C-alpha cells in the first residue's frame, strides 16, 4: 500500500472512544467457567530453596516413625529372633540415624561443590564416606 501524506485536522475537544482489539473484547466477554485453570508453575529451583529453608527451620523427624520402626525390627530379627524395643529406644535410634544422614549429605554436598557442581552424585557420597574414614 502506498504511503499518503497526512493533513492536520481540527480537534473538537471530545475524544472518540477507541475500538478494542477483537481478541481482547472476546477474552473479556467470554465466560471463564468453561476453561480449566492451569496450576501455577514456579521457576526451577524456587521450590527447592523454599523446602531447604523449611527443613532448616524445623527440628521434626524427617523419616516417618512407623516405617523406621519396621525397618529397625526387621534388622533386629535377622540378628536375634526374640527382641523387644522401648519406644524411646527406637526414637533415639531414629534421631541418631537422621543426624548421621544429614551430616553425610552435608559432606556430600561439599564434595559436589568442590567439584564445581551443584548436583550431588554417588561419587561424592563415596568420597565423603572415605574422607570420614568409613569403608566404601
From Swiss-Prot:
**Name used for this protein in its record:** Histone H3.3
Which InterPro entries does the entry mention? Histone-fold (IPR009072), Histone_H2A/H2B/H3 (IPR007125), Histone_H3/CENP-A (IPR000164)
Keyword vocabulary terms for this entry:
Chromosome, DNA-binding, Nucleosome core, Nucleus
> What induces this one?
In contrast to major H3, constitutively expressed in both growing and non-growing, starved cells.
A single GO molecular function term of this UniProt record: DNA binding
**PROSITE patterns for this protein:** HISTONE_H3_1 (PS00322), HISTONE_H3_2 (PS00959)
Purpose of the protein: Macronuclear replacement variant which replaces conventional H3 in a subset of nucleosomes. Nucleosomes wrap and compact DNA into chromatin, limiting DNA accessibility to the cellular machineries which require DNA as a template. Histones thereby play a central role in transcription regulation, DNA repair, DNA replication and chromosomal stability. DNA accessibility is regulated via a complex set of post-translational modifications of histones, also called histone code, and nucleosome remodeling. Functions redundantly to H3.4.
Name its cellular compartments.
Nucleus; Chromosome
Tell me a GO cellular component: nucleosome
Per the record, the similarity remark reads: Belongs to the histone H3 family.
Cysteine pairs bridged by disulfides in the record: none
Q: Which domain of life is it from?
A: Eukaryota
What taxonomic ancestry is recorded? Eukaryota, Sar, Alveolata, Ciliophora, Intramacronucleata
Give a short account of its post-translational modification. Acetylated. Acetylation occurs almost exclusively in the MAC.
What quaternary structure, including any partners, is listed in this protein's UniProt entry? The nucleosome is a histone octamer containing two molecules each of H2A, H2B, H3 and H4 assembled in one H3-H4 heterotetramer and two H2A-H2B heterodimers. The octamer wraps approximately 147 bp of DNA.
Tell me one Pfam family matched here. Answer: Histone
Q: What is its main location?
A: nucleus
PANTHER family reported for this sequence: HISTONE H3
Region listing for Disordered, in residue ranges: 1-41
Amino acid at each position: 500500500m502506498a504511503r499518503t501524506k497526512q493533513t492536520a485536522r481540527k480537534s473538537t475537544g471530545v475524544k472518540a472512544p477507541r475500538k478494542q482489539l477483537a481478541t481482547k473484547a472476546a477474552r473479556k466477554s467470554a465466560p471463564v467457567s468453561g476453561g480449566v485453570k492451569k496450576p501455577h508453575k514456579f521457576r526451577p529451583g524456587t521450590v527447592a530453596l523454599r523446602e531447604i529453608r523449611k527443613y532448616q527451620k524445623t527440628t521434626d523427624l524427617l523419616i516417618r516413625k512407623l516405617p523406621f520402626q519396621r525397618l529397625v525390627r526387621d534388622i533386629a530379627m535377622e540378628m536375634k529372633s526374640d527382641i523387644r524395643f522401648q519406644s524411646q529406644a527406637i526414637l533415639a535410634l531414629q534421631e541418631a540415624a537422621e543426624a548421621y544422614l544429614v551430616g553425610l549429605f552435608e559432606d556430600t554436598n561439599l564434595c559436589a561443590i568442590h567439584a564445581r557442581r551443584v548436583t550431588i552424585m554417588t561419587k561424592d557420597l563415596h568420597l565423603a564416606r572415605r574422607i570420614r574414614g568409613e569403608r566404601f
